[in-house]
Amino acid sequence: MKILVFNGSPKRENSDTLHITHAFLDGMQEAAPQEIQTIHVTDRRIAFCRGCFACKHNDGRCVIDDEMREILEQMLSADLLLFSFPLHSYGMPAGLKNLVDRMLPPCPPWP
């Protein structure tokens, strides 16, 4: 199984949240070997979604040329997506929220 982990903490490897995530992943590795890749969202160049919906008329391709294209390909090839983040003001950190907003292109079109 291929697992893609999104670390949304601005503290990257020093994040308490990521330490908990590693404990969870260690348990999964003990149960059955997994291929695990971690993306530190803070280290990636991901522009804000413009809300233009060009992706809905452009075969699911976003018009913004940044690292999100590569990330979307990794997401689509993964068997499991794991979002690891601390709560900031009862929500996810801004960088991870930005990534989630940019996940729109591969979604099926709505009526």
Report each predicted region and the residues it spans.
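Structured helix-beta-strand junction loops
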Residues: 31, 58, 77-78
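N-terminal beta-loop-helix "entrance" segment that forms/cooperates
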Residues: 38-60
